[in-house]
């Protein structure tokens, strides 16, 4: 079987606590080992911009990575892109599709509330952003068996 690595990472909830405490430090460690070479696209409804995301990533690394190397942090921040918008607004996903450019195998990481999983998945599908993609769900998958079953249909 042919190995097909992702060619972009999309972080939904990029300005949230999970990304700040766990995901950004993990990305730093991948970059340190030269294992992260693809664009990392943050998506959030924070009213910020790329500069704001870069500042947040730098603060996260400063707080959670002991002895961080500024050159590695710089390499990581050079990979960053940002899409600001509402998860309920199709325009956010149109902007994401444009930011993904030629990416054929993006990894969509959902570090967002479970209540918007289905909406995000539907918008990704409706804008052509899921063909060849993978979706990682970070949160509990539903509140109970019935809601988990509904989400698995999406």
PLM region spans:
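Conserved small/polar residues in nucleotide/adenosyl-binding loops
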Residues: 153-154
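Conserved acidic residues
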Residues: 86
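Short amphipathic alpha-helical segments
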Residues: 23-25, 54, 120-124, 149
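Short glycine-/polar-rich loops that comprise or flank the Walker A/P-loop
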Residues: 6-7, 34-39, 77-79, 105, ...
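N-terminal low-complexity, Ser/Thr- and acidic-residue-enriched intrinsically disordered segments
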Residues: 1-52, 97-98
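Beta-loop-alpha module in the N-terminal Rossmann-like domain of NAD(P)-dependent dehydrogenases
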Residues: 90-94, 98-134, 141-145
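Glycine-rich phosphate-binding loop and adjoining beta1-alpha1-beta2 segment
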Residues: 32-81
């Amino acid at each position: 079987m042919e190995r097909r690595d992702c060619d972009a990472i999309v972080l939904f909830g990029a300005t949230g606590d999970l990304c700040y405490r766990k995901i950004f430090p993990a990305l730093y460690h991948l970059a340190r080992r030269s294992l992260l070479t693809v664009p990392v696209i943050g998506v959030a409804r924070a009213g910020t911009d790329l500069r704001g995301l870069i500042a947040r990533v730098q603060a996260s690394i400063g707080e959670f990575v002991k002895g961080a190397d500024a050159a590695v942090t710089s390499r990581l921040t050079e990979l960053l892109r940002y899409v600001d918008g509402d998860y309920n607004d199709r325009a956010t996903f149109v902007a994401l599709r444009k930011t993904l450019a030629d990416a054929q195998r993006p990894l969509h990481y959902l570090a967002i509330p479970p209540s918007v999983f289905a909406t995000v998945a539907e918008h990704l599908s409706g804008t052509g952003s899921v063909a060849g993609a993978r979706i990682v769900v970070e949160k509990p998958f539903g509140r109970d068996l019935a809601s988990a079953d509904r989400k698995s249909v999406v």
